[in-house]
């Protein structure tokens, strides 16, 4: 949870990589995560998250396209990694019906399953969703922390105050 533009999706992908990649993984596994094509990684990033993104209603299964919703993905066992991870970005756009469809997976996740829900407005989620999640609040860095990071990267001749506020 946090304001727009703080890197929540980047953080979610980093956490996902740590959960899916191990010492036996190869560069192809890393590339598959980066391109959102890893078989144990489901990345939902729509402008509006609708009920069919979470679960299919009866007679809505598409044999050609196969697995296209979060709940069906979560019900499967991992195929190449020890864990499986579903990331739902823009969760603040889910209506109550979509959130309720996700509840079962949050209440009783299968083993080695992680669900990362990204929102710009956590108050838009149902209390039942919020209460079943571990919340990580992503806050903007202050100037001192940004300068320390710049120095750690070997950029000591630049100060964060050298940039206009819209760039930081």
Please tell me what each predicted stretch does.
Residues 89-91, 117-122:
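A short beta-strand-to-loop transition that corresponds to the Sensor-1 phosphate-sensing loop
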Residues 1-34, 111-113, 121-168:
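Charged, glycine-rich active-site and insertion segments that engage polyanionic ligands
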Residues 74-75, 98-117:
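Conserved catalytic/switch belt of AAA+ P-loop NTPases
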Residues 39, 78, 109-110, 141:
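Proline-centered helix-kink/hinge sites
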Residues 1-97:
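Clamp-loader machinery-focused feature within the broader ASCE/P-loop NTPase space
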């Amino acid at each position: 949870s946090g304001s727009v533009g703080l890197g929540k999706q980047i953080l979610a992908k980093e956490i996902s990589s740590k959960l899916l990649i191990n010492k036996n993984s190869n560069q192809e596994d890393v590339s598959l995560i980066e391109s959102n094509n890893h078989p144990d990684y489901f990345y939902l990033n729509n402008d509006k998250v609708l009920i069919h993104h979470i679960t299919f209603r009866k007679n809505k299964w598409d044999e050609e396209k196969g697995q296209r919703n979060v709940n069906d993905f979560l019900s499967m066992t991992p195929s190449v990694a020890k864990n499986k991870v579903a990331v739902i970005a823009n969760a603040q756009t889910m209506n109550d019906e979509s959130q309720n469809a996700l509840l079962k997976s949050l209440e009783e996740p299968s083993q080695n399953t992680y669900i990362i829900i990204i929102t710009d407005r956590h108050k838009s989620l149902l209390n039942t969703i919020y209460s079943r999640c571990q919340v990580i609040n992503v806050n903007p860095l202050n100037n001192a922390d940004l300068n320390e990071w710049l120095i750690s990267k070997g950029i000591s001749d630049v100060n964060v105050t050298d940039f206009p506020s819209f760039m930081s």
